[in-house]
């Protein structure tokens, strides 16, 4: 009788531990992982001011990319950014005309003197990429793209920052070392 009571007590303890272990695994599997963007990219932008105390912008499936209505070049920029984000994170972001609201906003203007300069400002509600020309906004998109980590199935935290950048030289060049690193034709185009 005593042996049976001890056996029942041990069984209850083991069942309780198994239940707690399963509950722990269930809680961990529901946890949403967030990866953080890194603004230390090449080429390094001219000015980077990170706001350490401010909340980051969370790039998730519900994020929208907005551009000025009626501007086809900016629409192409927005679609280009959406395709890059999909390749990097697997997230399909909606692209829509307009520049009001929460999300990633592409706009013309800003205080960049160079036509290829841009300003990238990240707050908890918005990522605003502005430039005096569509080319400037395009280069701002490149900075944002390089900052986003390759991470499928997780949200991306973009730390609050203000980046002002412009080309140091009047020309842009690139070299493809295809003898050691082969590139598909689509990526070269």
Task: Describe each region flagged by the PLM.
Residues 2, 70, 180-181:
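A generic structural signal for short
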Residues 160-189:
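An acidic-aromatic substrate-binding cleft motif
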Residues 1-40:
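Bacterial Sec-dependent N-terminal signal peptides
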Residues 30-169:
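Acidic, contiguous N-terminal accessory segments
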